[in-house]
């Protein structure tokens, strides 16, 4: 099929733009496909009509389809005209072309199983410039410089840009795209850009530049809840002055305008504050102001409030009873308030019980009461407490008036103490202990004579003991596990996610404790696999006293999150199990993870610097740690996961020195958009949070990049604490002031430059994890090239049978100047290694290869030697 110019057909008006294609099908004069003419490129002005045609020969009734950029043309007039029995013309009409009509056109027809297509026509639509970028509205401080951008395209090109400030031209001509630099404005101003080409001009939307200002005063300040020592405050912020509010100050005083007022600065939002350590029963007044980057607002109105008082703190003392002919007189000492906040005392409350029946409490003024409505023939139990408007104080010790007591006065309980119950209790305990000891002794003697008792039976070849199966059961039946999951009270969605990773408790054995935290612990375990072998794993479990279903669900959600991961540098879930407990208590959930021999990266870095046996980590090893973490985070970000808690402490170090990103307790999956906003209070790692997370509780992949920069700093400093000496509450102001973590000693400029890019105030200016991984791999490759150019490092390890005077094997290292040592100083990691062999270690891997080292069976690598080889790159190391 080919396109050619058409001179028109009878009955058709001349075409503004046309092409003709011929297709010779089987049965025509020419067999097969015959192309005529050449491809056509056509240019028309916007709004003009266009007609295209193609001819088909050798087919009686062809079904002609017009295509544009690979898609069937729908919204256009299409006509097929018969010229002869086997010749047809296909017409495509566009009444008024727009820019969207530009593209590559051709026609096609189906001949049996084969589709014939014509040569194509490239249609170009020219018109006035079209804006792809228009200047945007801005809010800026007074006299602060800013930029506006404008971009327009043709065809036809070139496109020239002119800038207008109101009705005044302030820039141009300039080629598109164009940026207007404005030194500053002092009032609301409109800007626009004008794009011109040979077809005409177009004007952009006006961009309104407004002036930022300090915010307006807050209003509707309310004290929402009040207790004796605390008060919660909420307020509505005033107009923000077109700048983000970053903090509010709550000023508290005993009286409005008092000089010694307490000021509490809180980050916002939310616009609430909890005031602590207030005095009970005290009058206070408070007011609030908020601040943005241009300064604070005026204070709002003073709001008075009073904290609640305290209930009495002491129980009445010397509570006693006196029998009389008319009744029972009760007396006690007056309760004197210990704290001024307790307030004035009200009546005393008298409680009395007779024959297991509790009577109504009596309200008594003063410290004396006469009880007449009681039965002297029955035992009586009495208590008394002080009360005030806030509540009741503690009750006194119970006073028992016996029906057999005919004394004229019932004194305080301590004056009638009886030693009989005490003596009986001690005797009972001694007798019980003696009986238990006797039983255990007799049982032990029977066990030691077990062999003698069954000698005759064993000699006859008969079994000494016969067993009968009481019942049969299956330990791994899913019904039991399902019932246990149901008892946890977790959501059906979470339960469904965990069903295929549940492991029966009987399939693994818990071992030693690896670590313990505030909410749980991690223990070593042996997991039995399907082939009967055992593999070492780590088991993470909640504390036994955490019984809330919400805590259990949050714990198991981390496991469900890890289930989706499959990457060498992201911790992978092995399974989930439930530890049964007696007496109907909730089972303890356990998350089973791969065993990481070297623990978390932060602890490993600390041990290399300040451990009992410090060792040096070469720069290549530190950069390799960063590459591994970047690989893992690149994988997570590609799956729309944000970690929210990336730090060295949450990265695990495997036996082969590869790093895995772990601890997904705070991670979230993003289902729409590219951000997650924290909606409830959680414990968050402030010193690893990005600016937008601190200010707006906003978390994206860009905030994870910020945390990765802090993690890089941790690695380069070998586990130091970031922002040492700066409190968490001061971090935001420290960062918003432009401050960042300083370059660590011995840190390469290229590495610190990457860190600094991660801490850009604009999240979109931070590099992606893919970019970070590639840059770090380049740095690592450069370090490897440098290290291979250095001399090999020789380490002579004496035989273990020849200890030094200190009693430990001696290590001799070949002497080199500091300029030659380079990063090969990592030999400190093998100080004091007992061995009877001689090894040559090369930081660059130029001496012996790993295979050569492994060919010495008489001198296997011990743990410290293996660690050094991994650091120097002489053993395999997984990569992403």
From Swiss-Prot:
Q: Which residues carry this modification: Phosphoserine?
A: 456, 808, 859
**Catalytic reactions on record:** L-tyrosyl-[protein] + ATP = O-phospho-L-tyrosyl-[protein] + ADP + H(+)
The stretches that face the Extracellular side, renumbered to this chain, are 31-419
Bilayer disposition of the protein = Single-pass type I membrane protein
The residue ranges of the Ig-like C2-type domain are 31-118, 129-209
**Glycosylation, residue list:** 53, 75, 181, 220, 230, 283, 356, 370
In the UniProt record for this chain, what is stated about the effect of gene disruption? knockout mice are fertile, but male animals that lack all three receptors TYRO3, AXL and MERTK produce no mature sperm.
Ranges annotated as spanning the membrane? 420-440
The protein's matches in SMART domains, at most eight in alphabetical order, are given as: FN3, IG, IGc2, TyrKc
For biological process, the GO terms are: apoptotic cell clearance; establishment of localization in cell; forebrain cell migration; lymphocyte activation; natural killer cell differentiation; negative regulation of inflammatory response; negative regulation of innate immune response; negative regulation of lymphocyte activation
Location in the cell: Cell membrane
Q: Which body tissues produce this protein? A: Abundant in the brain and lower levels in other tissues.
Instruction: Write one Gene Ontology MF term.
Output: phosphatidylinositol 3-kinase binding
Residues reported to bind ATP: 514-522, 540
Annotated catalytic residues: 645
Q: Note the PANTHER family from the entry.
A: TYROSINE-PROTEIN KINASE RECEPTOR, TYROSINE-PROTEIN KINASE RECEPTOR TYRO3
Tell me the protein's name: Tyrosine-protein kinase receptor TYRO3
Q: Which gene encodes it?
A: Tyro3
